């Protein structure tokens, strides 16, 4: 470990952690970056790994030994906190996959995508999401955009004119079932 005059130590994130926190009371998933990750917060995923906040919860047993099936958390709002602007995720794979109640994404300008290689299924199944502004996405390193907007049925318009797709290897079903 080496000293770093800005924040103490050298590490991949400069001593900072990028994470997502879910507030069950409001249905809000908030992305932040800070010196420590709070208990219960989710690490960001890498590559083709499904993010922890989109995985099914462990099934629960009630007193009669019946199993309550695992369910995904129900995300209705997403916030990218200003602190997240300095995070550099490498994958956005399935970040909001099947978030059928997601209506709003606040602060998406704080999502820096310059190092992202996978945007597959990022917004797939977001049936009621509208509007969505991806005009500032840096896609120069993205290789997978498959199913990125599948079944985004409420989107009235989507500006992808700034997308750099030179490295994209898979765009299959990118806009399938969009109106």
Region spans (language model):
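Extracellular/surface-exposed low-complexity segments
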Residues: 1-25
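Structural signature of tandem-repeat unit edges
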Residues: 1-2, 73-87, 100-117, 127-143, ...
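Short, intrinsically disordered, charge-balanced linker/junction segments flanking boundaries
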Residues: 11-14, 171, 175-179
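Generic structural motif
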Residues: 18-22, 119, 145, 171
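Short, well-ordered beta-strand segments enriched in hydrophobic/aromatic residues
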Residues: 29-33
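LRR N-terminal entry segment and analogous cap-like coil->beta motifs
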Residues: 36-120, 124
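Short beta-strand elements of solenoid repeat domains
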Residues: 97-98, 121-125, 147-151, 173-177
